[in-house]
């Protein structure tokens, strides 16, 4: 049974677009390292770590760290469908740009600001990919804002409201969920069309895509038609009923 699950999981991951696939493997590797006595907590993001200890890598690495099997599984269930759909439609380059810069930096910076200047808790850390999950889900909802989404088959809501309802329910139902990280991710998702529209993505892709598309499997090139319909060309049919824990370390 276990080998069958592992086999199907491997098959699923290998079919993902390359950047989504890379992020998946990195998160799994980081989680696996903890079983060998390697301290991975240093990858989390906190004011003390980043600014007092000058561990600058934290502003990027915190998204790769998860605290439990449930944490990483729930985040994968929420993130991978939305992220892979985005990468297929907008291209690998666009997906890399939004994840490395706004989807990672903005939630991290907001966490630092709120916990240092308002809550006075410099030791509280943030970790996990749930901020990305909210970002990609929000980005998908911007595409068809009036589209109705069934919420647990109980009632339907406009797509643009879904991330907000999702955020509220996660905050209430999930212990230690990072409201700041989730909300910041959702904001960046809503802003995705404006961010990609403000950069010369087409010209960048024309230079980069031919280099990688020929030898990198599952690399997706920029599609001008899809880009004109930002943030994705086709709406997601379903969303996960659980967005992931977004657990904060030390809180």
UniProtKB/Swiss-Prot annotation:
The active site is at residues 130, 182. Changing residue 130 to A: Abolishes proteolytic cleavage of sre1 and sre2. Does not affect interaction with cdc48. The chain crosses the membrane at residues 22-42, 59-79, 94-114, 123-143, 154-174, 179-199. Disulfide bonds: none annotated. Changing residue 246 to R: Impairs interaction with cdc48. Results in defective growth in hypoxic conditions, lack of sre1 cleavage, and decreased levels of precursor sre1. Pfam families: Rhomboid. Changing residue 244 to R: Impairs interaction with cdc48. Results in slow growth in hypoxic conditions, reduced sre1 cleavage, and decreased levels of precursor sre1. Disruption phenotype: Defective grow in response to low oxygen levels. Impaired cleavage of sre1 under hypoxic conditions and increased degradation of precursor protein via proteosome. In a dsc1 mutant background, results in defective proteolytic cleavage of sre1 but restores its precursor levels. It is a multi-pass membrane protein. InterPro entries: Peptidase_S54_rhomboid_dom, Rhomboid-like_sf. GO terms for molecular function: protein-macromolecule adaptor activity; serine-type endopeptidase activity. Residues 43-58, 115-122, 175-178 are lumenal. Its EC number is 3.4.21.105. One of its GO terms (biological process) is proteolysis. Residues 1-21, 80-93, 144-153, 200-251 are cytoplasmic. Changing residue 127 to D: Abolishes proteolytic cleavage of sre1 and sre2 cleavage. One of its GO terms (cellular component) is Golgi membrane. The keyword Plastid does not apply. It catalyses: Cleaves type-1 transmembrane domains using a catalytic dyad composed of serine and histidine that are contributed by different transmembrane domains. Interacts (via C-terminal SHP box) with cdc48; the interaction is required for rbd2-mediated cleavage of sre1 and sre2. Rhomboid-type serine protease that catalyzes intramembrane proteolysis. Upon binding to cdc48, required for sterol regulatory element-binding protein sre1 activation by mediating its release from the membrane and thereby regulating its activity under hypoxic conditions. Upon binding to cdc48, required for the processing of sterol regulatory element-binding protein sre2. Belongs to the peptidase S54 family. This is Rhomboid-type serine protease 2. The lineage of its organism: Eukaryota, Fungi, Dikarya, Ascomycota, Taphrinomycotina. The gene is rbd2.
């Amino acid at each position: 049974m276990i080998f069958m699950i592992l086999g199907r999981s491997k098959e699923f991951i290998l079919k993902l677009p390359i950047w989504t696939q890379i992020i998946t493997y990195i998160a799994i590797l980081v989680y696996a390292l903890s079983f060998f006595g390697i301290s991975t907590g240093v990858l989390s993001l906190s004011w003390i770590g980043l600014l007092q200890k000058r561990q600058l890598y934290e502003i990027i690495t915190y998204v790769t760290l998860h605290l439990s099997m449930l944490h990483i599984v729930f985040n994968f269930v929420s993130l991978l469908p939305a992220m892979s759909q985005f990468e297929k439609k907008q291209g690998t380059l666009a997906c890399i740009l939004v994840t490395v810069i706004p989807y990672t930096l903005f939630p991290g910076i907001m966490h630092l600001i709120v916990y240092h200047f308002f809550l006075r808790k410099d030791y509280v850390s943030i970790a996990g990919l749930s901020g990305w999950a909210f970002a990609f889900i929000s980005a998908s909802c911007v595409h068809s804002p009036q589209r109705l989404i069934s919420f647990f088959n109980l009632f339907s809501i406009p797509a643009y409201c879904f991330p907000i309802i999702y955020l509220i329910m996660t905050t209430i139902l999930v212990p230690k969920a990072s409201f700041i990280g989730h909300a910041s991710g959702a904001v960046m998702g809503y802003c995705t069309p404006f961010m990609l529209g403000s950069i010369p993505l087409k010209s960048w892709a024309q230079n980069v895509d031919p280099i990688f598309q020929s030898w990198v499997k599952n690399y997706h090139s920029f599609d001008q038609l899809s880009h004109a319909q930002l943030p994705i060309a086709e709406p997601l049919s379903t969303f996960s009923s659980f967005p992931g824990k977004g657990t904060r370390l030390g809180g």
